[in-house]
From Swiss-Prot:
Species for this entry: Helicobacter pylori (strain J99 / ATCC 700824) (Campylobacter pylori J99)
Gene from which the chain derives: ruvC
PANTHER family membership: CROSSOVER JUNCTION ENDODEOXYRIBONUCLEASE RUVC
Listed cofactors: Mg(2+)
Enzyme Commission number(s): 3.1.21.10
Protein name: Crossover junction endodeoxyribonuclease RuvC
Length: 157
């Protein structure tokens, strides 16, 4: 089974695809979608096109998205909600459903502490998947963590 984990962001959208087979996890690919255009409509289209490419190329079975973190800037939260809505619609069209996890759930699943720092989550991602190189930016390790969290909640196959 292939799981796509997504960490939506207003400038970078982290993604990771992991394989979950026989209770073993392995990383297939991970990266981020850089949102560089200035017009919101173009940003949404770029994001959706990139998601389409990932779904086509890697034959994803399940998708997990991290819930929006409510920061102090309402404008950023609204923009992020628009991105997340567009992602959700595309995933529903292509896959049929998706799962959502709060940052607290993801941190707790990987570190045992719902208030863990992003660096602690990145450390556990590397440890669980036997990754020796640095994972930068942290949007990528967050996306991997979302995928791992989802894999942990699935029934063994």
């Amino acid at each position: 089974m292939r799981i796509l984990g997504i960490d939506p962001g207003s400038r970078k959208c982290g993604y990771a695809i992991i394989s979950h087979a026989s209770n073993k996890l392995s990383l297939i690919t991970a990266g981020f979608i850089n949102i560089t255009t200035t017009r919101l409509q173009e940003q949404i289209l770029d994001l959706i096109e990139a998601l389409d490419c990932l779904l086509d190329r890697y034959e994803v079975n399940e998708v997990a998205i991290e819930d929006i973190f409510f920061g102090y800037n309402p404008k950023s939260v609204i923009k992020l909600a628009q991105f997340r809505g567009a992602l959700s619609l595309k995933i529903l069209e292509r896959i049929g459903n998706f799962s959502e996890y709060t940052p607290l759930q993801v941190k707790k699943a990987l570190t045992g502490n719902g208030k863990a720092a992003k660096e602690q989550v990145a450390f556990m991602v590397k440890r669980l998947l036997n990754i020796t190189s640095e994972i930068k930016p942290l949007d990528i390790s967050d996306a991997i963590a979302v995928a791992i969290t989802h894999a942990q909640r699935l029934k063994p196959r």
